[in-house]
Structure formats: structure tokens, C-alpha cells
Amino acid sequence: MQNSDLVGVWRELGRENVAGDGSIKPDVPRASQIMYTPDGYMSVVNTPKGRKPVNETAGRMDLDATSPAERAQAAIGVVAYAGRFEVKGEEVHHMIFTAVNPNRVGETQRRRVTLSGDDLTLSAPPDAQGNFFRIHWRRAGK
């Protein structure tokens, strides 16, 4: 596999937690999109479905005009980051340049990649007990 195989926009179909014993438990529904560009950049935005709207922000994209409580509520469960990507064997490495969680900046997220036509699966490395999560994506427009 190579970088060009991932280029495009992908929408999440679903995610699941896989236990070390092989049992699978679906995770909460999410609204997610990941993009890979031909020149090696990527970004992902992942939010819980059904988030409540905040008070009007006068057309602003940020939440600076909302209350601290509204900002906190809007941010719960949000994962968003961007940076560079590189396919290495059966893995894709996301080198994080900017992120909602500032602790992730400078990290590299490794995901095992499975690609079948317009369907993509990204799996996190297993923890010490063999548990991991995976996200299923479909190429946008397919």
C-alpha cells in the first residue's frame, strides 16, 4: 500500500471495540470525516452524533462568544487533528501538527490499514490486554 491509495475524503461508517478474546462491541455513533491529500497532508474531525446546539455565535466558527459551560459541553468527545501522513507497510502514520487536544501535538498516531475498494478500516495498536478499537470508513460519494 502507498500514500496515493488513501488520497481522498472518507466518512465514518461505524466503530467498534475489539477485546483481547476477540469479542466485538459497537461503539457510540459518531459523525466523522478524514481527508488525505496527494501531497501527504491529512486531517480528521470526529464528533459525537446528536450534540446540542450552542447559543448563537453571531456567525462565528469558534465558540469564543459562548459561555464556558457551553464551550465545555460542545467539546466533550470531539477529536480533531491535522498534520502529515505516511503509509508504512500495513500501517498509516499520522504525524500531528495541530489538534484540539494540545497534548497530542508532535505525536505520531499509528493505525493498521485495511483497504477494500471504497472501504477503509483503521485499527489502533492493541493495548497490553490485546484490546483495540477500529473505525470503518467509506470513500465519500460512494
Predicted regions and their residues:
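Lipid interaction determinants
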Residues: 1-80, 87-142
